[in-house]
Curated annotation (Swiss-Prot):
InterPro entries: Cyt_b/b6_C (IPR005798), Cyt_b/b6_C_sf (IPR036150), Cyt_b/b6_N (IPR005797), Cytb/b6-like_sf (IPR027387), Cytochrome_b (IPR030689), Cytochrome_b_C_euk/bac (IPR048260), Cytochrome_b_N_euk/bac (IPR048259), Di-haem_cyt_TM (IPR016174). PANTHER family: CYTOCHROME B (PTHR19271:SF16). Signal peptide: none annotated. Its cofactor is heme b. It is a multi-pass membrane protein. The cytochrome bc1 complex contains 11 subunits: 3 respiratory subunits (MT-CYB, CYC1 and UQCRFS1), 2 core proteins (UQCRC1 and UQCRC2) and 6 low-molecular weight proteins (UQCRH/QCR6, UQCRB/QCR7, UQCRQ/QCR8, UQCR10/QCR9, UQCR11/QCR10 and a cleavage product of UQCRFS1). This cytochrome bc1 complex then forms a dimer. The keyword Heme applies. Heme 1 (or BL or b562) is low-potential and absorbs at about 562 nm, and heme 2 (or BH or b566) is high-potential and absorbs at about 566 nm. GO terms for molecular function: metal ion binding; ubiquinol-cytochrome-c reductase activity. SUPFAM superfamilies: a domain/subunit of cytochrome bc1 complex (Ubiquinol-cytochrome c reductase), Transmembrane di-heme cytochromes. The chain crosses the membrane at residues 33-53, 77-98, 113-133, 178-198, 226-246, 288-308, 320-340, 347-367. Heme b b562 binds at residues 83, 182. This is Cytochrome b.
Length: 379
C-alpha cells in the first residue's frame, strides 16, 4: 500500500512541494528568505484580519479606531505593532530575496523572476494603501502626494486621479476603497506566490555555484524543512525584539497626529522601504520624468535576464561583478538615506548622482563587467 501523502490528491501536491521535493545539497541560508516571506505573509494576513474587526474606514473615526485598538482591545497594541513592523520585516526579507536572486543569477529562471516582479509591485501597492489607513498626517499627505503623481500621465492623468480619489481630494471614498483593496490584495499575493512556487518547481532551485545540481539532490524534508524552521526562529527573535522594545523605531512621528488637510507636514516622506524609489522620483525636476524613473527603478529588474552577458550564471567566481553588485547595494542605501532628507543642497546632487549610478550599474556597468570576465577567463 502506498503512503497516503503519495496517493491522496491534495497531500500529493504538498508532498511534491515541501516533503519529497529534490533540492540541491549546497543551498545556503540566502535560500531561506522564500520561506520567511511566506511566514511574513501569514503574520500579516492573520494580524490584519484581527485589526479589521475593530478598524473603521471612515475619515471621522479611522484614527480614533486605531487608538481604540491600542488602548482598549485585548492585546490590540501587540497586534497593531506586529502588523506595522511586520510590513518592515516583509520588505527586509523581500530585498534580501531579490538581492540573492541577482547575486546568484536566479533571474535566468525567467517565468519565476517575472512573477516575482509582479509580486513586488503587488506588495508595494498593498503596503502603500495600508499606510493610508490609520489616517494620520503622513497617511493623508502620503496618499495625496503619491496618487497625485498619476496626474503627470498625459491626457488621462487628471481624470484618473479623480477616479482613484472618488472625488476632488483624498477623502472618505478614497479611504474606504483603500481599505477594501488593502484587505483583498494579500490573498491575491498568496495566490501569486503559489504560481511563483509552481514555476520554480518546474526547473528546481538554483544553487550558489550556479551549476546544474541534478547529480546531487537531497529531499526537502527533513533537511531544508528544519533549516527553514531555524530561519523562522531567528526571524521571530529579531521581529519580537523590534515589536516589544522598539515598536515605533521604523514609523513616522507625524502619523501620531490625526490627518489635517489644512496643515502640511514639513517633510512628506513614505515608509523607509520606499525611500530609495522616492529619492529616484525626486531626483528628476520634471513630474512626468520623475514618475517614469520611479516605475523604471522597479521595472528595470525585468531586464536582468536580457542583460546577463557572463558565461557563468552565479557571481560566486566573478570578482568584478561582485564589486558592481556591492556598489549597487551601497548605492541603494545612499538613495534610502537621501529619500528621508529634505530637498536642499547637498542632498539634491547626491540623490541625482546616486540615481544615475543605480541605472548605470544595472544597464551598463554590470553587463560590461560580465564581458570583461569572459575575456579574462578566455571562456
Amino acid at each position: 500500500m502506498t503512503i497516503m501523502r503519495k496517493s491522496h490528491p491534495l497531500m500529493k501536491m504538498v508532498n511534491h512541494a515541501f516533503i519529497d521535493l529534490p533540492a540541491p545539497s549546497n543551498i545556503s541560508s540566502w535560500w531561506n528568505f522564500g520561506s520567511l516571506l511566506g511566514v511574513c505573509l501569514m503574520i500579516q494576513i492573520m494580524t490584519g484580519l484581527f485589526l479589521s474587526m475593530h478598524y473603521t474606514s471612515d475619515t471621522l473615526t479611522a484614527f480614533s479606531s486605531v487608538t481604540h485598538i491600542c488602548r482598549d482591545v485585548n492585546y490590540g497594541w501587540l497586534i497593531r505593532y506586529m502588523h506595522a513592523n511586520g510590513a518592515s520585516l516583509f520588505f527586509i526579507c523581500l530585498y534580501f530575496h531579490i538581492g540573492r536572486g541577482i547575486y546568484y543569477g536566479s533571474y535566468l529562471y525567467k517565468e519565476t523572476w517575472n512573477i516575482g516582479i509582479i509580486l513586488l509591485f503587488l506588495v508595494m501597492a498593498t503596503a502603500f494603501m495600508g499606510y493610508v489607513l490609520p489616517w494620520g498626517q503622513m497617511s493623508f499627505w502620503g496618499a495625496t502626494v503619491i496618487t497625485n503623481l498619476l496626474s503627470a500621465i498625459p491626457y488621462i492623468g487628471s481624470d484618473l486621479v479623480e477616479w482613484i480619489w472618488g472625488g476632488f481630494s483624498v477623502d472618505k471614498a478614497t479611504l474606504n476603497r483603500f481599505f477594501a483593496f488593502h484587505f483583498i490584495l494579500p490573498f491575491i499575493i498568496a495566490a501569486m506566490a503559489m504560481v511563483h512556487l509552481l514555476f520554480l518547481h518546474e526547473t528546481g532551485s538554483n544553487n550558489p555555484l550556479g551549476i546544474p545540481s541534478d547529480s546531487d539532490k537531497i529531499p526537502f524534508h527533513p533537511y531544508y524543512s528544519f533549516k527553514d524552521l531555524l530561519g523562522v526562529l531567528i526571524l521571530f527573535a529579531f521581529f519580537f525584539t523590534i515589536v516589544l522594545f522598539f515598536p515605533d523605531a521604523l514609523g513616522d512621528p507625524d502619523n501620531y497626529s490625526p490627518a489635517n488637510p489644512l496643515n502640511t507636514p514639513p517633510h512628506i516622506k513614505p515608509e523607509w522601504y520606499f525611500l530609495f524609489a522616492y529619492a529616484i522620483l525626486r531626483s528628476i525636476p520634471n513630474k512626468l520624468g520623475g514618475v517614469i524613473a520611479l516605475v523604471l527603478s522597479i521595472l528595470v529588474l525585468a531586464l536582468f535576464p536580457l542583460l546577463h552577458t557572463s558565461n557563468q550564471r552565479s557571481m560566486t567566481f566573478r570578482p568584478i561583478s561582485q564589486v558592481m553588485f556591492w556598489i549597487l547595494v551601497s548605492d541603494l542605501l545612499i538613495l534610502t538615506w537621501i529619500g528621508g532628507q529634505p530637498v536642499e543642497p547637498p542632498f539634491i546632487i547626491i540623490g541625482q548622482a546616486a540615481s544615475i549610478l543605480y541605472f548605470s550599474i544595472i544597464l551598463l556597468l554590470x553587463p560590461i563587467a560580465g564581458l570583461i570576465e569572459n575575456k579574462l577567463l578566455k571562456w
